[in-house]
Swiss-Prot record:
Residues 863-882, 987-996 have a biased composition (Basic and acidic residues). This is Kinesin-like protein KIN-5C. Residues 12-359 form the Kinesin motor domain. One of its GO terms (molecular function) is microtubule motor activity. Keywords: ATP-binding, Coiled coil, Cytoplasm, Cytoskeleton, Microtubule, Motor protein, Nucleotide-binding. GO terms for cellular component: cytoplasm; microtubule; spindle. Residues 406-526 form a coiled coil. One of its GO terms (biological process) is spindle organization.
Length: 1009
């Protein structure tokens, strides 16, 4: 919950990135650059080659400073706001983080010695963050004119041991050794922070004192030379500045505002294999990397909001505890190298710095202290200092620290030099003052002379002004008079321009009227010529149309006569074919009747044979029954056991014979039914043929009637058309002679309408005749096709009936043979049974077996005889049926061939008639098309209508000016124009406007006349 609260209300750690330029060694070795900085977009791009692939990683920070960035740029953009917040009462921390040799110490300290070339001891351009922050603090405090006090501490963390870099140097060797053996302890302050017991706090009053302390402490800091850095820091340093500022509340109470600035220069992480560290240097590098690794773990824990943050794993992280996740505003300056051999350390630094951006601190303003509390603390400090002074002054003379003595001597020398410089400046100022006094006296004399000349010039000016006023008055009068003349001339010019415009309009109207008259005469001539040409075209068309109509009438008459002849031929052919068909039907009836009688006789013979066979079988059965009865007494006991078997065999034989008789009767009945069906179909075919020829005769008669009617209607329409055309032409000719110009268009329209209507009626009549003939021909074709289809169907049915009869006879013959075989089989089974009985009763029934065997043989002989008779009857019946069927089929085929021949003749006749009609239709269409083309050529091409040429003038009403308009064109009198000008432009108003002589818009007298 607390981490989420800090995240909501906290402030992110500010992370800056600075890239150093290439060193001399790197430039000599042409080391590739793998890091590029974009200051504007605050991005850093690192190029990598992983598995042969070029990969760029981009990191974003709060601010980015490239190799060309100066110390002042970094300080002004990043550190100035932090120092201002320290002066507002916040605790702030700035520390540099990065690999060894990337410029951390240079960024934090730089060149902190005072520049001798600058006045008043200014800072050099290479000064780092610490000296610039010190200077800003004292400049701000001096500018505020507030009461303040500043304390500084400077400690070093070397191999996890804290050393005071500001400790006095005059300690005895024993004391120094004891102090080295017992490093300064690090203790908790009870408020979440830490403090170092025994750490010296130096009170300073100026920036120079801080610079001196900074130089003294930096000289004590442990450094060593490695392969990567000639002056590598082997320890972490922490420079703290504590500021107390006095403030007064509106109630008059005095409070002390406290702010603290921690400036940390971390030792750089290094790779021992590349830095060349050995023995003690290797141990130093291990401790440095260990503390920096702990710092990275702390950053990761804070970013991931873990429950445990390992602050206590290193004294460095304990010192920076309040700066990382505490109540301090923190700024991290990450320094990197652009060279490729430092790529691994550069990526590590960028990763940790980028993660540190997500750390959120919760800065708070330090609580202001009461003045009494601070005075109480100061009293204790004063008592401690008094004890030290008393102990120091037990000797003779005045005791002063060496640093203070050297400082006062240097200040005295500086002040003496400044006094000498100021004395020389005073002498120079006196000389300049004397020169200025001499110049002032000369200036006064020149001023008096100029005053005299000014008086004379003013007198001349007053006289000149009077002359100028009179001249201006005369000039105004002259200009006013010229304005009057210009106004009169302009009005007269306007009248003149209007008259000229009116004259030009009249001239153009006159020329246009002349051209219109000539155009009208030309149009009348063109219309007369066109009327004469059209009259000739109409006369020629009348003669040609009469000739074409007479030719058309003759062709229609000849076509009608050909149609009558053709219809008579079709009628004769149909009658002859009808008579032949009736004869064939009579012959067919006779043959069918004879076949029926023959079938009846054969059926009676078969029935007689069946009856005889039945009687013989019954006699045999009776004899067998009697014989069996006579021997029943002797073999009762034995027959009792086989009675059922014997009776069943004879029952089966009896049933087989009965079924044989039934099959024969059914065969005869079905044969009669089939012949009866054949007769009915033959009668239906005969009736249909008669009906067909009757319909054909009716259609022929209808065609003759319709052709005659069409011929009469065509002749009448042609006669009516000729009469109407002659009357219309005569009346139109009379009217054209009377008024040709006005009635040409109406004559042409009536001629067109008359010809079009008559041609349309003629075409309708021709098309209706063609339609009727086509319908008639199609009806005849349909009847013929229907008759042919019926006859083919009848032939196929008759052929199928005959084939089915033959198949039926063959099937019945097979059935009869099967029944006979079954009878023989039953007899053989009975014979076998009797044989078994005879063998079993051989001794008792030898005589009876002999009798039964003779009876069976006689029955078999009778059966064989019966089969022979049935076969002979069947053979005779098959021969007769086959002969009659062949005769009927031949007769039907002959009738079909005759019918096909007659139908083909009729079809040929119809086709020739169709061709005749088509040729007649084509001739009529060609003739009508010729008449239509001639009419179109006459009335659309030769008969020319008048076409506008565009030269005929349109009707225009000329604009005739009235007398009042002509009178208004006169120019006004000059006196009237002068009065009008003076009314609109008075002399007084003109005089007020023309205060100066104006340049005229025209040269004098250039356009007056």
């Amino acid at each position: 919950m607390s981490s989420r609260h800090d995240k909501e209300k906290g402030v992110n750690v500010q992370v800056l990135l600075r890239c150093r330029p290439f060193s001399d060694d790197e430039l000599r070795s042409n080391a590739p650059q793998v890091l590029t900085c974009n200051d504007l977009q605050r991005e850093v791009a690192v190029s990598q080659n992983i598995a042969g692939k070029h990969i760029d990683r981009v990191f974003t920070f709060d601010k980015v400073f490239g190799p060309s960035a100066q110390q002042k740029d970094l300080y002004d953009q990043a550190v100035v706001p932090i120092v201002n917040e320290v002066l507002e009462g916040f605790n702030c921390t700035i520390f540099a983080y990065g690999q060894t040799g990337t410029g951390k110490t240079y960024t934090m300290e730089g060149e902190c010695r005072r520049s001798k070339s600058a006045p008043c001891g200014g800072l050099p351009a290479e000064a780092g963050v610490i000296p610039r922050a010190v200077k800003q603090i004292f400049d701000t405090l001096e500018g505020q004119q507030a009461e303040y006090s500043v304390k500084v501490t400077f400690l070093e963390l070397y191999n996890e041991e804290i050393t005071d870099l500001l400790a006095p140097e005059d300690l005895s060797r024993v004391a120094a050794e004891e102090k080295q053996k017992k490093p300064l302890p690090l203790m908790e302050d009870g408020k979440g922070g830490v403090l170092v017991r025994g750490l010296e706090e130096e009170i300073v009053t100026s920036a120079n004192e801080i610079f001196t302390l900074l130089e003294r402490g930096s000289s004590k800091r442990r450094t060593a030379e490695t392969f990567l850095n000639k002056q590598s820091s082997r320890s972490h340093s922490l420079f703290s500045i504590t500021i107390h500022i006095k403030e007064a509340t509106p109630e008059g109470e005095e409070l002390i505002k406290c702010g603290k600035l921690n400036l940390v220069d971390l030792a750089g992480s290094e790779n021992i294999s590349r830095s060349g560290a050995r023995d003690g240097r290797a141990r130093e590098a291990g401790e440095i990397n260990k503390s920096l690794l702990t710092l990275g773990r702390v950053i990761s824990a804070l970013v991931e909001h873990l429950g445990h943050v390992p602050y206590r794993d290193s004294k460095l992280t304990r010192l920076l505890r309040d700066s990382l996740g505490g109540r301090t505003k923190t700024c991290i300056i990450a320094t990197v190298s652009p060279a490729v051999h430092c790529l691994e350390e550069t990526l590590s630094t960028l990763d940790y710095a980028h993660r540190a951006k997500n750390i959120r601190n919760k800065p708070e303003v330090n609580q202001k202290m009461m003045k009494s509390t601070l005075i109480k603390d100061l009293y204790g400090e004063i008592e401690r200092l008094k004890a030290e002074v008393y102990a120091s002054r037990e000797k003779n003379g005045v005791y002063m620290p060496k640093e203070r003595y050297y400082q006062e001597e240097s200040e005295r020398k500086v002040m003496a030099e400044q006094i000498e410089q100021m004395g020389g400046q005073i002498e120079n100022y006196q000389k300049q003052l004397e020169e200025l006094q001499d110049k002032y006296v000369g200036q006064v004399r020149e001023c008096s002379d100029l005053t005299t000349k000014l008086d004379i010039t003013e007198k001349n000016l007053s006289q000149t002004c009077k002359v100028l006023a009179s001249t201006n008055e005369e000039l105004k009068k002259s200009q006013y008079a010229m304005k009057e003349k210009d106004f009169i001339i302009s009005e007269q010019k306007k009248s003149e321009n209007v008259l000229v415009q009116q004259a030009c309009i009249l001239q153009s109207n006159l020329e246009k009227a002349t051209k219109d008259n000539s155009s009208l005469h030309q149009k009348i001539g063109r219309e007369d010529k066109l009327s004469a040409d059209n009259r000739k075209v109409v006369d020629n068309y009348q003669v040609e149309l009469s000739e074409q109509i007479s030719n058309l009438f003759n062709r229609v008459a000849s076509c009608l006569s050909q149609q009558n002849v053709h219809l008579q031929g079709v009628n004769k052919l149909s009658q002859s074919r009808l008579e032949a068909h009736n004869k064939a039907i009579l012959e067919m009836k006779k043959k069918v009747k004879a076949s029926r009688d023959l079938y009846s006789s054969h059926l009676e013979a078969v029935q007689n044979v069946v009856r005889l066979h039945k009687a013989n079988a019954n006699a045999c059965l009776e004899e067998v029954s009697a014989l069996t009865t006579s021997s029943a007494c002797s073999i009762d006991e034995f027959l009792a056991s086989g009675d059922e078997t014997t009776s069943s065999l004879f029952d089966e034989l009896q049933s087989a014979l009965s079924s044989h008789q039934g099959e024969m009767a059914l065969f005869a009945r079905e044969l009669r039914q089939r012949f009866h069906t054949t007769m009915e179909q033959t009668q239906e075919m005969s009736e249909y043929t008669s009906t067909f020829f009757q319909k054909l005769m009716e259609e022929s008669k209808n065609a003759e009637t319709r052709a005659a009617e069409a011929n009469d209607s065509q002749i009448n329409s042609i006669i009516d058309f000729q009469k109407t055309y002659e009357a219309q032409s005569k009346s139109d000719t009379d009217k054209l002679i009377a008024d040709l110009t006005n009635l040409v268009s109406s004559h042409i329209r009536r001629q067109h309408e008359l010809v079009d209507s008559r041609l349309h009626n003629f075409k309708d009549a021709v098309s209706s005749n063609k339609t009727f003939l086509d319908e008639h021909v199609s009806a005849v074709n349909n009847l013929t096709k229907d008759a042919k289809r019926k006859w083919e169907t009848f032939s196929m049915q008759a052929e199928n009936e005959a084939r089915e009869g033959a198949d039926f006879s063959a099937a019945k013959h097979c059935r009869m043979e099967l029944l006979l075989q079954q009878s023989v089989g039953h007899a053989e089974s009975a014979f076998k049974h009797c044989k078994i009985t005879h063998e079993s009763l051989k001794e008792m029934t030898s005589k009876q077996v002999t009798d039964v065997s003779s009876l069976v043989r006689s029955a078999c002989d009778s059966n064989e005889q019966h089969d022979a008779e049935v076969d002979s009857a069947r053979t005779a019946a098959e021969k007769d049926v086959t002969k009659n069927s062949d005769d009927i089929i031949q007769q039907i085929e002959r009738m079909s061939e005759d019918e096909k021949a007659s139908v083909s003749k009729i079809l040929e006749n119809v086709r020739s008639h169709e061709k005749t009609l088509e040729s007649f239709q084509q001739d009529q269409c060609c003739q009508a098309r010729c008449i239509e083309d001639k009419a179109q050529e006459t009335f659309q091409q030769q008969y020319m209508e008048y076409e506008p040429t565009g030269a005929t003038p349109t009707k225009n009403e000329p604009e005739i000016p009235t007398k009042a308009t002509i009178e208004s064109l006169r120019a006004m009198p000059i006196e009237t124009l002068v009065e009008e000008f003076r009314e609109n432009n008075s002399y007084e108003s003109f005089a007020t406007k023309e205060t100066k002589p104006q340049q005229l818009t025209r040269s004098p007298l250039s356009q007056v006349n």
